């Protein structure tokens, strides 16, 4: 995983499995795939993104790994929860997320020039929209074509 990327389901399975000190064969056996080479191969395929487990199997994997199934779910999450998991992924993937208290508020410090530049551009566009220097259509056009 590159800095700032989010983890896919397979990467999350691998992260938690390793964190739990579990071998692929062990996880395969716990979820009913058998503990031999076939089970290990299936888990490897899930972790490497070659196959995606269906929701019922994701439930079994979540139970075996002792985690909330929402962490592995491919179903829609709320925007806020998507952001939470994205921040967790960034933190694991080498883009440290610092939490700072300032004036009684908790703030995120992503300590990344790309985000600083982006936030400045976005703040300027929002100010331009508010002052009617640009139209709502111009603002939407900027957002959907943003390249960083």
Report residues per predicted region:
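Helix-turn-helix DNA-binding elements, focusing on the entry/boundary residues of the two helices
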Residues: 13, 24, 40, 55-58
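Residue-level detection of the helix-turn-helix DNA-binding "recognition helix"
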Residues: 18, 32-33, 48-50, 77
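A short, Lys/Arg-rich alpha-helix, primarily the initiator
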Residues: 1-20
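Short alpha-helical DNA-recognition segment
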Residues: 21-45
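Charged, low-complexity interaction regions
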Residues: 133-136
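Charged, helix-prone or intrinsically disordered regulatory segments positioned adjacent to compact structured domains
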Residues: 52, 56-130
